[in-house]
């Protein structure tokens, strides 16, 4: 699991 990918996905969702 890559936390960085999750962060980028969340930021993209914003």
Curated annotation (Swiss-Prot):
Modified residues (Leucine amide): 14
Summary of the tissues where the protein is detected: Expressed by the venom gland.
Keywords, ordered alphabetically: Amidation, Membrane, Secreted, Target cell membrane, Target membrane
Subcellular location: Secreted; Target cell membrane
Main location as per UniProt: secreted
CC per GO annotation: extracellular region; membrane; other organism cell membrane
Function noted in UniProt: Antimicrobial peptide with activity against Gram-negative and Gram-positive bacteria, as well as against fungi. Has potent hemolytic activity against erythrocytes.
Family: Belongs to the MCD family. Mastoparan subfamily.
Protein name: Eumenine mastoparan-EM4
Organism: Eumenes micado
């Amino acid at each position: 699991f890559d936390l960085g990918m999750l962060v980028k996905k969340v930021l993209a969702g914003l």
